[in-house]
Amino acid sequence: MADPQATNGTGAVCAERDASDVGDVSDVGDARDEGAGRVVAVRGAVVDVAFDGGALPALNEALTIPVDGAAPILAEVHAHLSDAAVRALALGPTGGLRRGAAVRATGGPIRVPVGDAVLGRLLSVTGAPGDDGAALAADVERRPIHRGAPLLAEQKSANALFATGIKVIDLLAPLAQGGKAAMFGGAGVGKTVFVMELIHAMVERYRGISVFAGIGERSREGHEMLLDMRGSGVLGRTVLVYGQMNEPPGARWRVPLTALAIAEYFRDERAQNVLLLMDNVFRFVQAGAEVSGLLGRLPSRVGYQPTLASEVAALQERIASVEGAAVTAIEAVYVPADDFTDPAVTAIAAHVDSMVVLSRAMAAEGMYPAIDPVASSSILLDPLVVGEAHVEVAIEVRRVIEHYRELQDVIALLGIDELGADDRRLVGRARRLQRFLTQPFAVTEAFTGQAGASVEIADTIAGCRAILRGDCDDWRESSLYMVGTLDDARRKEAAAREADARREAAAAASGAGPGTTSDPASGSAEPQGARHGR
């Protein structure tokens, strides 16, 4: 029999294991009770358990393993190795676990608390409170984390707009109420801030329930989000479910299912709209790859698990709306090395209605939210859904910005003055559109000192139409930067002109003469890196 603690020489657990590697079934001793077993091998997060007598626990059934001086370890069955042994994945640290430890099958899958008792709470993958609040009542209702998607006849199509108040989203990549949207971006481009702003929008606009699944993210970010939600007053209608990056892969892999079980309860039993936010779905795939390796499966492309497509589909298909209640999913997706052809990214993208692409170049220029207006898209951008006027403005905005990008190499080499009059005019309007599509967020008020702005779709369309028409050609670009509506920009422009007039008057009175004011076409306060030659 192979050494139960054998490794591959690098500290990683050997993947080549079979039923003969489980350990001697006689180690079970006298544990002949129904559902009772003994640990016969421990390899990191993988625990092999032998049962003597009675039926084996079913796949996905939960097992509890008492540990001296610590909370019991919860594990989940993932393979039947023989007629008397199973392989389980521990959802917590296995330190202190030893061969021969007693194991008890629970008779069903992991069950987590649901209902009003979990609102405003931070939970682990098993539903245990992770905040400084009181323990949950023993009689709180619980639901299994494993469940099928609603029947097709029960599902409702997502064709109603989910207005976010974020201009670039509502105009160019509108979200569906009851649909799925994903934000794709590399590290440090603002995915988490964007998720928090959407939670704020849900609470303010729809008075619904928000369920946030933190999958494999930093503990510091999770703590900051908890404090921010408390400070902003949105925590009372939000449930936070965390599986941090320091936790075993099994916990990170099952966190989305725990969040889904809670969201499904409010959808089915309370008929309430739910905003389900997941940050980060790539970490779910990553945890699945770790689990696959621990269970001895051969990897597929780029080291991902061979079941990548089916695992992503099983998760995404459960996110569904029914008559009377909608589950709207917003998913942050990390793009490794900014490679949008990565198998994990393409597998997730196949299931979403709206794709929001966050651009590192936009972030470098200070254009926040750093959403690429050309690469982002939505199936809802259709005249039958949003109307002809909306689609016409969105198409023209994309065309103008895309043409400006095509001219940027020429501008960098020769300068903007070498362009024709029409192209110079288009470049000016494209730059003003880019700045108008920025806006301050409510969740960043404490850092920027600028009040957040939520803009109606009609105001966004009217503002973009005015810029495309040339109504703002003589405005400073800085007047359109980080504002809400065009009226806000108009007031900002008027204030800047008044300030220039006062400076000119003061300069004339002192004899210095005019000529020290900023260029009214470009403004003096534009974001770093936003000059024409960039």
UniProtKB/Swiss-Prot annotation:
| CDD domains listed in its UniProt record | ATP-synt_F1_beta_C, F1-ATPase_beta_CD
**SMART domains of this UniProt entry?**
AAA (SM00382)
- UniProt topology in membrane: Peripheral membrane protein
Q: What GO terms are given for molecular function? A: ATP binding; ATP hydrolysis activity; proton-transporting ATP synthase activity, rotational mechanism
Entry's EC annotation: 7.1.2.2
Q: Where in the cell is it found?
A: Cell inner membrane
Name the predominant localization. membrane
Source superkingdom: Bacteria
Keyword Glycoprotein found:
no
Q: What is its EC class? A: translocase
InterPro entries in UniProt? AAA+_ATPase, ATP-synt_VA_C, ATP_synth_F1_bsu, ATPase_a/bsu_AS, ATPase_alpha/beta_chains, ATPase_F1/V1/A1_a/bsu_N, ATPase_F1/V1/A1_a/bsu_N_sf, ATPase_F1/V1/A1_a/bsu_nucl-bd
Disordered, as annotated region: 494-534
Listed GO CC annotations:
plasma membrane; proton-transporting ATP synthase complex
Compositional bias per record (Basic and acidic residues), positions renumbered to this chain: 494-505
Annotated positions binding ATP:
185-192
Question: Which Pfam families does the record associate with it?
Answer: ATP-synt_ab, ATP-synt_ab_N, ATP-synt_VA_C
Q: How does it assemble?
A: F-type ATPases have 2 components, CF(1) - the catalytic core - and CF(0) - the membrane proton channel. CF(1) has five subunits: alpha(3), beta(3), gamma(1), delta(1), epsilon(1). CF(0) has three main subunits: a(1), b(2) and c(9-12). The alpha and beta chains form an alternating ring which encloses part of the gamma chain. CF(1) is attached to CF(0) by a central stalk formed by the gamma and epsilon chains, while a peripheral stalk is formed by the delta and b chains.
Which protein family is named in the record?
Belongs to the ATPase alpha/beta chains family.
Q: Briefly state the protein's biological role.
A: Produces ATP from ADP in the presence of a proton gradient across the membrane. The catalytic sites are hosted primarily by the beta subunits.
Q: What is this protein called?
A: ATP synthase subunit beta 2
Q: Which organism is it from?
A: Burkholderia mallei (strain ATCC 23344)
